[in-house]
């Protein structure tokens, strides 16, 4: 809640997603804040959206969560850009479909408060370097829109989460 970047490391099925979902949903409801969730696979992203939709239905929260990936129909993309409170995607879609077209996402970026990166252990080696560069571009575009989102980085299986998280976002975590 203080806006500091954080790394969350806890075993699988221990409630990691609740650690970030509760403040994200609360901010979306109270302040119209936006969040971008990044997962390394479509399956994980779709699971997260299903959980968010179930939480939303159960609590009648009014928070709109959408998957934005290569399978997202063209006619749905504009609605996601304009009305998504939580956009769930992957680093490649961020790189290829969101950042190059950031002017179409202006309303989203102007209100972006959280960037959640799950399964950070998947981002190492050449792919990890690529993701670091994509995140660098994301931060530059966020600065253009006058925001500095909080990064929340998660993993269940990483030996040195603090150092790895800092290397990914190139900031103190």
Regions found by a protein language model. Give the residues of each.
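Conserved H-loop
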Residues: 159-160
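Conserved P-loop/Walker A NTP-binding site and adjacent catalytic elements of P-loop NTPases
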Residues: 1-145, 149-154, 163-168
């Amino acid at each position: 809640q203080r806006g500091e970047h954080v790394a969350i490391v806890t075993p699988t099925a221990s409630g990691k997603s609740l650690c970030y979902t509760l403040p994200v949903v609360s901010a979306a409801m109270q302040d119209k804040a936006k969040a971008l969730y990044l997962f390394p696979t479509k399956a994980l992203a779709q699971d997260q959206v299903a959980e968010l939709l179930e939480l939303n239905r159960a609590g009648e929260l009014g928070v709109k969560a959408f998957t934005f990936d290569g399978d997202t129909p063209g006619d749905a993309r504009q609605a996601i850009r304009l009305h998504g409170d939580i956009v769930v995607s992957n680093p490649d879609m961020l790189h290829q479909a969101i950042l190059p077209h950031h002017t179409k996402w202006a309303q989203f970026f102007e209100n972006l408060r959280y960037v959640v990166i799950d399964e950070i252990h998947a981002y190492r080696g050449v792919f990890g370097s690529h993701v670091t560069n994509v995140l660098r571009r994301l931060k530059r575009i966020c600065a253009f829109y006058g925001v500095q989102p909080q990064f929340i980085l998660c993993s269940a299986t990483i030996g040195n989460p603090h150092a790895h998280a800092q290397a990914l976002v190139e900031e103190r975590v």
